[in-house]
């Protein structure tokens, strides 16, 4: 069983990842979900996958979700949501599917916790390539590029 933390769960890669989870419930369990501001979809995902932790990076969206959701999932807001999802003890793999350089810090923190990384954020490798790859080697962490563009960037960064 793989225990997943999905950062960017309401975006294209995040929803596709959750589709795979739904098709293989015997192989995957979602332990954390984080989105930027899509309250409605995140709330639906929380109810369906029942993660231990869920969060919204956008503070006003987070406050609205707090007012709407009263279930057992722990809610986290702001930048702390990214770090909570990246470092949650139960996760064996962290999927980073958020846009831009915002993916660097949670990826670094997940690596430091020994999590396998499913990388769907090319900016993390473009902007933080040497840091990310050296940390992955230091901590013995596997980075799995999620699509062919990321795979090419990943291969390039390891060769330089």
How does the language model describe each region?
Residues 1-54:
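N-terminal Rossmann-like dinucleotide-binding module
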Residues 65, 100-113, 122-142:
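Rossmann-fold NAD(P)-binding glycine/threonine-rich loop
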Residues 16-23, 44-45, 125-141, 156-159:
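Active-site-proximal loop->helix
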Residues 10, 46, 94, 114, ...:
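Residue-level signal for inorganic ion chemistry
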Residues 43-47, 83, 108-109, 134:
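Alpha-helical segments flanking ligand/cofactor-binding loops in enzyme cores
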């Amino acid at each position: 069983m793989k225990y997943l933390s999905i950062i960017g769960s309401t975006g294209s890669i995040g929803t596709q990842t959750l589709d795979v989870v739904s098709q293989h419930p015997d192989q995957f369990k979602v332990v954390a979900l984080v989105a930027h501001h899509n309250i409605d979809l995140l709330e639906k995902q929380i109810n369906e996958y029942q993660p231990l932790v869920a969060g919204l990076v956008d503070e006003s969206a987070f406050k609205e979700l707090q007012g709407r959701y009263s279930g057992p999932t722990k809610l986290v807001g702001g930048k702390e949501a990214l770090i909570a999802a990246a470092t949650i003890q139960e996760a064996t793999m962290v999927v980073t599917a958020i846009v831009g350089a915002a993916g660097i810090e949670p990826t670094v923190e997940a690596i430091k916790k020994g999590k396998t990384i499913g990388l769907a954020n090319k900016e993390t490798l473009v902007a933080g390539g040497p840091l990310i790859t050296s940390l992955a080697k230091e901590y013995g962490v596997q980075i799995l590029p999620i699509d062919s563009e990321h795979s090419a960037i990943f291969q390039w960064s390891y060769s330089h």
